[in-house]
Design a protein with these regions (language model features):
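Gly/Ala-rich beta-loop-alpha elbow adjacent to hydrolase catalytic centers
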Residues: 63-72
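Glycine-rich His-Gly loop
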Residues: 7-11, 65-66, 89, 174
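Active-site catalytic motif of lipid deacylating hydrolases and related acyltransferases
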Residues: 2-57
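Conserved serine/cysteine hydrolase catalytic core
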Residues: 147-207, 211, 220
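Active-site signature of alpha/beta-hydrolase-fold catalytic machinery across serine-
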Residues: 19, 74-78
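Flexible "cap/lid" loop of the alpha/beta hydrolase fold
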Residues: 77-120, 153-159, 182, 186
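Conserved alpha/beta-hydrolase catalytic His-Asp/Glu region
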Residues: 118-163
Length: 221
């Protein structure tokens, strides 16, 4: 039995993965969803991801979404994960350190931080984020689970383990939000799949996203 550990972005929290977790469990998989509540540094977030991995036998697959993709290779090395399925996620550099936000995003975030250097909740970064959610109730659930991270989090850098791109990996993209990362995954020879949708498509169609994760997991086994 495959064991999935779903890694949410520290910006939006575990609520973004709960519908997919329910679908995967209904299909007979073992599923854990990491919580990054209270985490404000990359080290704390990585530790929370590692702590979410339950003991047990069987193939284990990490499933990072969005910003969690930067840390997934380090988590996989720490827990001995069998593979990683990146879901509309950022990817670190193949070698050397990677800042936890691209330079153009850092410039944008610098203008959002308050006098203490703390950013507003993620859904307040944008003029209109309503299209990201299927309904008001789902939006409220996600907003209740959001954390406010310091700007310093995104100015930090992570250094993935040497040779991390050789670990069995797949990439599930939602539309073209992470088009460059998708192209990179293809160039690395990873199996890929694209579902048309926004960045939180797992909230709109958890069954399709769960099916995509399951398919890619079987292709990297």
């Amino acid at each position: 039995m495959t064991r999935y550990v779903l890694l949410p972005s520290p910006l939006v929290g575990a609520a973004t993965w709960r519908p997919v977790a329910e679908v995967l469990r209904a299909g007979g998989a073992s599923v854990a969803v990491a919580s990054t509540d209270g985490c404000t540094t990359p080290e704390q977030v990585q530790a929370a991801y590692v702590a979410a991995v339950p003991p047990g036998d069987g193939a284990m697959v990490l499933v990072p979404h969005s910003n969690a993709g930067y840390l997934a290779a380090n988590v996989a090395a720490a827990v001995g994960s069998a593979g990683v399925v990146y879901v509309d996620a950022a990817l670190p550099a193949s070698t050397g350190p990677t800042t936890l936000a691209p330079s153009e995003l850092l410039d944008f975030l610098a203008g959002l931080a308050d006098e203490d250097g703390v950013l507003p909740p993620w859904t307040q970064w944008w003029d209109d984020s309503d299209g990201l959610f299927p309904d008001d109730a789902t939006r409220a659930e996600v907003e209740a689970d959001q954390s406010r991270l310091p700007l310093a989090y995104f100015r930090s850098a992570v250094r993935p383990p040497t040779g991390w791109t050789a670990r069995p990996s797949g990439y599930l993209a939602f539309g073209d939000t992470y088009a460059e990362e998708l192209e990179r995954a293809i160039s690395l020879g990873w199996p890929t799949r694209v579902l048309e949708g926004g960045h939180l498509h797992q909230l709109h169609d958890p069954a399709a996203v769960a099916a995509g994760i399951t398919e890619l997991s079987s292709r990297i086994a």
